A protein has these predicted regions:
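Phosphate/diphosphate ligand-binding glycine-rich loop within oxidoreductases
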Residues: 2-114
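Glycine-rich adenosine-cofactor-binding loop
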Residues: 9, 98-103, 110, 114, ...
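Helix N-cap at the beta1-alpha1 junction of Rossmann-like dinucleotide-binding domains, i.e.
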Residues: 12-13, 154-155, 223
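Active-site capping/gating segments
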Residues: 108, 221-222, 238-265
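NAD(P)-binding Rossmann-fold cofactor-contacting core
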Residues: 142-167
Length: 275
């Protein structure tokens, strides 16, 4: 019998996860099907319950449900516990096992696929939601010179700073600030972890945040440049990357976790782009 998997989110029509996992399944000869589930806002648990009742084996979780998945799971891996968010679930009987592969996928894409070492770099992360929580500790493990979390609500960014100071192994300086506090500051790598690009909204960022030669990376993706990457391009940034590579890398981790086999390394970003 074909095993069923899916990605749940809202919106979900833009997701490339089904194409990526189908490519992985074909290359590793796995009998599985992978679809999309549009989760109702406020109805995450009911949507997952229905998928499980139909025989679903596992799900990827995307915005805005990563915190809902954290609450839904019965067994949280250390990566999910640290992040306080979940992006992959595996169903075995009444147990719901949960992982967070976002940070691992992001770091692998940036460091290995894009050949951009993060050690010693000044990093700015925009947003303080589930995506940032998932990426925070893997980014700090790369030992950047500093990491700044900027958010409209500074208190949320400060919560993540406290989390980082409690759990990080490297003594990387981590600070929180509002978006309006970024004037005059420059960074080597700027990550957009907000949902603004999904809504085609540009963030109010000063051009100065992008240091000469900076990398601009949007954790989301779409057709063409996202609103954040368009803004970066307008300020003169040429190293522009969306989250397709991160998506493919975290998908490879989830696929291996579910199926016990791994798609051939080095092909993840290519698969993501082709899909």
């Amino acid at each position: 019998m074909t095993d069923r998997y899916a990605v749940i989110g809202n919106p979900i029509e833009q997701s490339k996860s089904p194409l990526i996992h189908t490519a992985f399944a074909q290359s590793t000869h796995q009998d599985m099907a992978y679809g999309k589930v549009l989760g109702p806002l406020g109805g995450f648990a009911q949507a997952v319950d229905a998928f499980r009742a139909e025989g679903g084996k596992g799900m990827n979780v995307t915005a805005p449900f990563k915190l809902d998945a954290f609450a839904y799971a019965t067994d949280l891996a250390p990566s999910a516990q640290m992040a306080g968010a979940v992006n992959a679930m595996k169903f075995e009987g009444k147990r719901v096992y949960a992982e967070n592969f976002d940070g691992v996928g992001l770091v692998r894409d940036v460091v290995h696929n894009l050949a951009c070492p993060l050690r010693g770099q000044r990093i700015l992360v925009l947003g303080a939601g589930g995506a940032t929580r998932g990426a925070l500790l893997p980014l700090l493990a790369e030992q950047p010179a500093e990491l700044v979390i900027a958010n409209r609500t500074v208190a949320k960014a400060e919560e993540l700073v406290a989390l980082a100071q409690t759990h990080q192994r490297a003594a990387v300086p981590v600070r929180a600030c509002g978006l309006s506090d970024l004037a005059g500051k420059a960074f080597d790598v700027v990550f957009n972890a907000t949902s603004a690009s999904l809504m085609a909204e540009a963030l109010p960022l000063p051009a100065s945040v992008f240091a000469p030669g900076a990398l601009a990376y949007d954790l989301t993706y779409g057709k063409g440049l996202t609103a954040f990457l368009q803004l970066a391009q307008q300020t003169g940034v040429t190293r522009l990357h969306d989250g397709v590579g991160m998506l493919a890398e975290q998908a490879a981790e989830a696929f291996a976790w579910w199926r016990g086999v791994r798609h051939r390394r080095s092909e993840e970003r290519r698969v993501g782009k082709e899909c």
